[in-house]
Amino acid sequence: MSYTKHKTRNISKAANSLQEECIRVPKVYDWVTDQLSVKKKIEFTHEQKKKIEEAMDDPSRRPLRIVCETPYVPPLFSLNKPDHDQCEDFYCEQVGEKRDVTVPVNGEFVDAQLVDLLFTTEIKVKVVDRHGCEVVDVNCNASVMESFVLCYPHGTELMCEISKIVCRIPSGTVLLNCPAPSCFTLEITFCV
């Protein structure tokens, strides 16, 4: 079997060819994802409970629903810069100093850093009637702290991104009959 050698071609560069340039881009040392959940007990005041029961007494407003509104989550941002708290309803911050640790990775021990991160959010919980009209609202804040082992050498910029904040009411969201509940549990999940 014989092979034919390819003909050598001279390809000229276009007149507008780009020259090679160096650009500065961030180097990613580590990336972690997790789901962090916290439960909060939400209590209605006597006045709020009275408004809920008045709405439930009106058949044209039943059923009532409990809904929760989570804040807009910002895009990836640096924790090392002072302007990282641009969103008033959401915070991500490093608590304390990072600590050097040695951890096993693939059978070898490597140096890493242990970092405690605190995630905090403001959530608005509303009771609405069948038409979506607000009966009462309750503001609630929730925080969760988690330790992460990272490759975080000196001079590295720590970035934070929460892809979503989810709130749910495990006991259900529909209110049909009196008496109105005086409290319920709200479960908040931070997707980091």
State each model region's role:
Residues M1-V192:
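Viral structural modules
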